[in-house]
Amino acid sequence: MSAEPVCSALPAIPYHKLADLRYLSRGASGTVSSARHADWRVQVAVKHLHIHSPLLDSERNDVLREAEILHKARFSYILPILGICNEPEFLGIVTEYMPNGSLNELLHRKIEYPDVPWPLRFRILHEIALGVNYLHNMNPPLLHHDLKTQNILLDNEFHVKIADFGLSKWRMMSLSQSRSSKSAPEGGTIVYMPPENYEPGQKARASVKHDIYSYAIIIWEVLSRKQPFEDVTNPLQIMYSVSQGHRPDTNEESLPFDIPHRALMISLIESGWAQNPDERPSFLKCLIELEPVLRTFEEITFLEAVIQLKKTKLQNASRTVHLSDKKKRELSPNIPVNSGPREESCGSSQLHKTSGSPGTSRSLSAPQDKDFLSAKTQDFSALHQCSVNHSRNSDFCVDCQVAFCDHRTAPCSLAIVNPLSAEGNSGRFQPGIAQQWIQSKREDIVSQMTEACLNQSLDALLSRDLIMKEDYELISTKPTRTSKVRQLLDTTDIQGEEFARVIVQKLKDNKQMGLQPYPEILVLSQSPSLNFFHNKSHKK
């Protein structure tokens, strides 16, 4: 007998309204993506459950009830839930998008954030305590039980938004659905887990003190900007050490003497991670201790700290793009950089680039270095002596992406894409032509791609070493054709242009005419391309 469906007060958000879904991260609670709501015209975040087999109605309702509770927890320092996407093959919570990522990124990306001012660090600690204290004061109390720096998000002004609280059923379902233990960051969670929770029988008695232990670890991490137990790789070693009473060092090396209010903060840390749960303070007591500390900083210092971080972040993003551009010119000095996608034609013997100014053109040429030809992840494109190295890794600076054209054939359409076009100076690359086309046709592809076309796409990706075994299994083990196609398209968003081109080509090969017009691209197998190139060079 199926469970009664949950009558949710949460707004229902249809999947097709979540445009431009882009993978952000994956954790114990599911996969997080960014998206743009088609009607609201704002960026949102979507946390969706890892579903490998159909959920029972009772399981789905358990998850929806949790989401309903989270929706009621409205507070300044709690991540707002905007709605639920509840469809047969997709179950996700839609929240506000946090542009400054997580506290974990702020603390440990030291190149991006070389200095995190003390006023802001203490404000963050205070706001975490305010948020968890609010949850504990709900009726009944809402316990987080997975508090860690990855779940503390930061809005545009670096204010705290606590996420992933009250998702015990969600996490349980996600973990049971997951085929790989690696998808759950157990080591990371163990660091913040109190020792009494290593023994499941002890959980009920000590549950209200779980979050304060996690908070003590977070305080240490914020003050030191180090990973707790960073030298220990085995979670079992951490569990044994902590159960014996060991904790991260509070000596001068970890917590220097120049930390403001150092003695008070160490006292708060040590009481928070006490071995006996009954000796740990409540969050209310923590707030009483922290409020005088916050008053020692003038309001202007918080504003200055935020401006400093934003300025540093923008400068580093700009420098990254500049260095990438410089490196690209050094690697391929004769290949000009375009400002965006352009359509070109190639003639019988040489390739011309149409510049931004009408009536001007330049020949493209590139070295015949065989290292370029042997690169495993290249997106091979050329004419005669032109070859371009391409990597599927989005962090690598790609020179250029072009379609290959044989001078012995008729002129063909040639797309040149500049993957260095940054979105908002963020250093993220714009998707290529095939990726853009797939994103624009996403729902049409989901409804029209046949099982045969799907299988051919997976086989082609495997033969080109473009898909990892884990991703292949994740797609192939989905219960229905549409869920397999959705997972394939999600993977395409992550893997890049070469991956996308294979899918587009297979759709064309299978005569999926309802998806026309197709983009002008050409996918080549590696060996014919290489043979053609070598034959050309030998003939010369």
Curated annotation (Swiss-Prot):
InterPro entries noted in UniProt: CARD (IPR001315), CARD_RIP2 (IPR042149), DEATH-like_dom_sf (IPR011029), Kinase-like_dom_sf (IPR011009), Prot_kinase_dom (IPR000719), Rcpt-int_Ser/Thr_kinase-2 (IPR017322), Ser/Thr_kinase_AS (IPR008271), Ser/Thr_Kinases-Pseudokinases (IPR051681)
UniProt cross-link Glycyl lysine isopeptide (Lys-Gly) (interchain with G-Cter in ubiquitin), position: K209, K536
Gene Ontology terms, MF aspect: ATP binding; CARD domain binding; caspase binding; JUN kinase kinase kinase activity; LIM domain binding; non-membrane spanning protein tyrosine kinase activity; protein homodimerization activity; protein serine kinase activity
Free-text description of this protein's post-translational modifications in UniProt: Polyubiquitinated via both 'Lys-63'- and 'Met-1'-linked polyubiquitin following recruitment by NOD1 or NOD2, creating docking sites for downstream effectors, triggering activation of the NF-kappa-B and MAP kinases signaling. 'Lys-63'-linked polyubiquitination by XIAP is essential for NOD2 signaling and promotes recruitment of the LUBAC complex. Also polyubiquitinated with 'Lys-63'-linked chains by PELI3, BIRC2/c-IAP1 and BIRC3/c-IAP2. Ubiquitinated on Lys-209 via 'Lys-63'-linked by ITCH. Autophosphorylated. Phosphorylated at Ser-176, either via autophosphorylation or by LRRK2, enhancing activity. Autophosphorylation at Tyr-472 is required for effective NOD2 signaling. Autophosphorylation is however not essential for NOD2 signaling.
Spans annotated as Disordered: 318-367
Entries under Pfam families matching the protein: CARD, Pkinase
Active site: D146 (proton acceptor)
Binding residues for ATP: L24, S25, R26, G27, A28, S29, G30, T31, V32, K47
Entry EC number(s): 2.7.11.1, 2.7.10.2
Similarity field: Belongs to the protein kinase superfamily. TKL Ser/Thr protein kinase family.
Complex and partners: Interacts (via CARD domain) with NOD2 (via CARD domain). Interacts (via CARD domain) with NOD1 (via CARD domain). Homooligomer; following interaction with NOD1 or NOD2, homooligomerizes via its CARD domain and forms long filaments named RIPosomes. Found in a signaling complex consisting of at least ARHGEF2, NOD2 and RIPK2. Interacts with ARHGEF2; the interaction mediates tyrosine phosphorylation of RIPK2 by Src kinase CSK. Interacts with MAP3K4; this interaction sequesters RIPK2 from the NOD2 signaling pathway. Interacts with IKBKG/NEMO.
Protein name per UniProt: Receptor-interacting serine/threonine-protein kinase 2
